[in-house]
Structure formats: C-alpha cells, structure tokens
Amino acid sequence: MSGHLGRVLQFHLRLYQVLGFHGLPLPGDGNPARTRRRLMAWSLFLLISLSALVLACLFSGEEFLYRGDMFGCANDALKYVFAELGVLAIYLETLSSQRHLANFWWLHFKLGGQKTGLVSLRSEFQQFCRYLIFLYAMMAAEVAIHLGLWQFQALTQHMLLFWSTYEPLVWLTYLRNLQFVLHLELLREQLTGLEREMGLLAEYSRFASETGRSFPGFESFLRRRLVQKQRIYSHVYDMLKCFQGAFNFSILAVLLTINIRIAVDCYFMYYSIYNNVINNDYYLIVPALLEIPAFIYASQSCMVVVPRIAHQLHNIVTDSGCCSCPDLSLQIQNFSLQLLHQPIRIDCLGLTILDCSLLTRMACSVGTYMIYSIQFIPKFSNTYM
C-alpha cells in the first residue's frame, strides 16, 4: 500500500494486521516486501493455531462440549464446527487474495483516498462514524453482557472451558464482519461523493437553462465533466470487484457462521426453558443479532446510491437554448448505459444479494427452525422415551 492514510483508518487497519486479516503493509512500514511475508506467516500461524484449538475442543476428554445430554453436546459441537469453517475461510482468503486487496487500496488512493493535508481527528471520526459506531457498540455489548451474565449464572467447568475457547472465535468472526463494513464504507464514500458532483452538474445546467447565462464552450465543459465522472464510476466499480475478489468466500462463511449460531442458540434456549434448565448464556446471542444487520445496512447503503446518481444524471438539462447539445445527450445516454451494465451489486458468490430482503429470509428461516423445535422437543422428554 502506498499513499498516506488518516489516523483512524491507519489504527484500525493495524488492528486487522494484528488479527491476521490484513496482509498488506501500511504506508510508512519499512521494507514492505519483508513486512508482507511476516504478515502472511502470522496469518498462517493463527490459522493453524486456531484450527488446532477447535480440534482439541471437539475431541478432548475435558468438558469443552456439554455432557449433560447429547442434544446440548451436538449444539456445542455444531458451533465449534461452523466457527472453524469461518476461521478457515477468513485466513485462507487472507492468504490467497492479496492481489485483489492491493488493487482495492490502489484504486482508493487513486480516487483521492489519501490525506494530502492535515485532517483533523474530528473530521476522520465523522467520515467513519457509522463504522466506528458498529465496531465499538458491538464490543461494548459483548463485554457488558459477559460481565452481567456471570454475576447471575453459575460458572461451571464446562462454561469456563467452552466460553474461554469459543469466545475468541466469536470475536474474530465479528471483527471480520466489521472489516467488510469498513471497506463498504470506503465504497459508499466514493459513491456519495460522485452523487454530490453529479448534483452540481445538474444545478449548473439548470441554472444555465433558466437564466440563459453560460460561457463559451459550456457544452464541452459538461461533456468533459461527465466523461470524468464516468471514469470515476468505472474505478468505483473496479473497487467493488476487488472487494468481492478479496472477501467473497469469507463473507459467505461469516454470515453463515453467525446465522447458524443464532439458530442453534435460539433452539437451545427453547430447549433449556422447556426442560427447566437454568442457563442464561443464550443472552450472548444479542451482539450476533446486530452483526448481520450492520453488514447488510452497509451493503444496502452502497447499492441505493446508484439510482440517485442516475437521477442526478438525468436531471442535467440538454434541451435549453444555451445548451441544446445532441453530443451531450449522447454522453448522458452513454453514462446511463454504463450504470446499467456496471451495477453496484453486492452478493455472496452470486448466490444472493446482500440487501434488506435477506434479513427477512433469515428471520423466516430461524422462525421455521423454532416452529419445528417446538413440535419436536416434547419427543425428547421421558414420556416419549
């Protein structure tokens, strides 16, 4: 990575380096090639260590899995297995997608993402406000629920062993999800900037149309600006493709891991309540309930900007006395076709679009799962044995 990053962005990218999620050296790192090799070796070490931890938990004779009944044991094993799936996807993709990630940041700097002057810390916080709220709200909620839970819940050996090994996997999954959000916020920033500039062009043309005041070469000016905006949009579209190339598999794995955890914990919550088992640790799914909406909100926020750009594009006046320009109309049509053929569409390997309708489908799937559990759990009671 070349260029200069703001302090907020630099700090959080450094955090992702420590977690093994970001394998590129940051601006200012000495000997970038050696730093890259060390980061990749660190990611590989974390992958092997965490995978060994999960295998040890699954096959150890200690109480990492719930031993009270096979149902609880299977639930804990399922959470470990899908957490391992998420870990594999995260670190293997980190190791294999360096080129896509490097291209993403190169395009970001090319579009003006580097801070050439002194930018106040307050401005940086405002720029990444939504990402910072998602990140630190999740961290605060997770810590607060843990601190509150263990004041009322007896800490058995099983709970100590399970949560001391499973909770790090949960945090890695959450932080990877918020890494997606950070990159989507950078995409959204470029798109909203383009929308503002298109709005200014529409205002210029409308003012010229209503007042009859313009300057020689006004048509050429508008056309040049439109061509420039088309190039910017093309670079933003390339950023999207690089984002998908860098994170596609781990997006699917992380969302699946979080969704499976929610479904399993909801199932086990009803099972515990039905069998009068005192177990309050299912409250720990509350942060998980916020993770998927946070990512989908960031994804949806990117995708909804493109129709607004198209709206501003078609607000440019071309049929007034001062700028009755067939060439300008043709340029607008060309840009419109570009928006149509290069859509900002964020999906999981082409399987499903990551918009708000996905939340509805996931809620329905968990609801269906709970309906089946309500019908089948009585069959596990002694009267049916």
Swiss-Prot record:
Role according to the record: Gustatory receptor which mediates acceptance or avoidance behavior, depending on its substrates. Required for sensing and avoiding L-canavanine, a plant-derived insecticide.
UniProt keyword terms in alphabetical order: Cell membrane, Membrane, Receptor, Transducer, Transmembrane, Transmembrane helix
Record note on disruption phenotype: Leads to an inability to detect L-canavanine.
Superkingdom of the organism of origin: Eukaryota
Membrane topology field: Multi-pass membrane protein
Single GO cellular component term: dendrite
Main location (coarse class): membrane
Membrane spanning stretches: 39-59, 70-90, 132-152, 155-175, 249-269, 285-305, 348-372
GO MF annotation: an example: taste receptor activity
One GO biological process term: response to L-canavanine
UniProt name for this protein: Gustatory receptor 8a
Protein location: Cell membrane
Cytoplasmic face of the membrane: 1-38, 91-131, 176-248, 306-347
Keyword Cell membrane: yes
Extracellular membrane side: 60-69, 153-154, 270-284, 373-385
Gene field: Gr8a
